[in-house]
């Protein structure tokens, strides 16, 4: 563990929160950034850019077609001194274009780290010019475990897998668990076959099935969105989970990756039902019994699965508590940040250890039957 001089940041976080707006897929990224600021000596740099401008559009279209990467309108980093770590999270390969505008990030940091969220193997070729920008970083981390090898081969740089995480404290239903008044909660992509079956089941049994009824990618406020999501899942008995882009094989091909929903469901103590990803990383991260109760995508038998689970209250309680404990002890953002620091050759600060102590105390409460 390291100590840090008061007022002197050792980490500079480049955040796109003023560029991407409050897109829902960005909310977990901002959650991670905010926790880093709480547990480390970090400074947040969040420049603005007009993504609808001609300049931004032209730079993006050009990078799709040529190896020329122009600044899309990002103001460069001013003289801020020197940091131990420069850290950024990119949602998609196109976001890497921002670092044509802040090319001096290597000059002001000992180690530069980029965490890339969504990158499918099938999309590597068309995004190759964007991905070349990753060659500027010292450390490249990926949320998609199966993309690590092909991306490493493209940029001739070792990439590593970093699993998604969760604010396990905010999502934790303990020490004061509330009544789970929502029977089934489904958010995001869904099977229409399973959805129609759940609608029928809810009508016939007068159960509460909560699901999306509008389309759109923007939240009003990212923090409020995450807080509301945590509140809803904590009040849900069953939470539907499936691998990323499960309904879009044209983009993902045969690739199977772990989405945020698995971490959210476990942390909030909901019983997760859906597809168990055929992914080696998943078997390491969610290896405990009943982590996910399998319901095949497009299944019309989900009502029978729920009926079987409802017949065994002791099993239900065990599933809930185990998921919460696992999230608190393994999947909180503090553990992900420790992995980032390790890649940069740094130790966590005291605030990180204090958060881990709090997580362990909550885990002790959750484990008590």
What are these regions (language model features)?
Residues 118, 164-167, 297-299:
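Short, acidic/turn-prone active-site loops that include or flank metal/cofactor-
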Residues 257, 287, 296-297, 320, ...:
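Active-site/pore-lining binding-face segments in mid-to-C-terminal subdomains
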Residues 114, 272-275, 293:
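Short hydrophobic alpha-helical runs that function as membrane-insertion/retention elements
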């Amino acid at each position: 563990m390291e100590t840090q001089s008061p007022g002197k940041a050792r980490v500079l976080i480049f955040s796109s929160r003023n560029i991407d707006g409050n897109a829902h897929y960005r909310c977990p990224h901002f959650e991670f950034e905010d926790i880093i600021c709480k547990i480390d000596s970090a400074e947040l740099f969040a420049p603005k850019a007009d993504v609808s401008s001609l300049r931004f559009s032209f730079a993006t279209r050009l990078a799709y077609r040529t190896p020329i990467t122009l600044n899309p309108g990002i103001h460069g980093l001013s003289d801020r001194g020197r940091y131990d770590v420069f850290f950024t999270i990119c949602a998609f390969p196109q976001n890497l274009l921002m670092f044509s505008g802040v090319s001096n990030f290597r000059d002001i940091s000992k180690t530069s780290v980029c965490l890339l969220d969504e990158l499918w193997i099938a999309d590597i070729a068309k995004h190759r010019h964007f991905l070349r920008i990753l060659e500027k970083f010292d450390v490249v981390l990926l949320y998609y475990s199966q993309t690590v090898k092909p991306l490493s081969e493209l940029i001739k740089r070792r990439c590593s897998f970093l699993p998604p995480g969760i604010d396990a404290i905010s999502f934790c239903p303990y020490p004061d668990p509330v009544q789970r008044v929502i029977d089934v909660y489904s958010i995001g992509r869904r099977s229409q076959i399973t959805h129609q079956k759940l609608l029928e089941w809810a009508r016939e049994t007068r159960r509460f099935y909560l699901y999306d009824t509008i389309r759109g990618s923007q939240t009003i406020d990212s923090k409020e969105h995450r807080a509301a999501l945590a509140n809803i899942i904590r009040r849900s008995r069953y939470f539907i989970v499936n691998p990323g882009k499960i309904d879009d094989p044209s983009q993902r091909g045969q690739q199977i990756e772990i989405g945020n929903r698995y971490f959210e469901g476990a942390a909030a103590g909901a019983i997760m039902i859906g597809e168990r990803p055929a992914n080696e990383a998943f078997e390491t991260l969610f290896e405990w019994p009943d982590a996910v109760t399998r319901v095949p995508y497009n299944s019309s038998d989900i009502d029978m699965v729920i009926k079987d689970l409802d017949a065994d209250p002791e099993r239900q309680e065990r599933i809930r508590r185990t998921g919460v404990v696992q999230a608190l002890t393994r999947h909180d953002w503090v553990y992900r940040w420790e992995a980032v620091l390790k890649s940069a050759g740094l130790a966590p600060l005291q605030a990180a250890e204090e958060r881990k102590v709090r997580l362990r105390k909550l885990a002790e409460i959750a484990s008590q039957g």
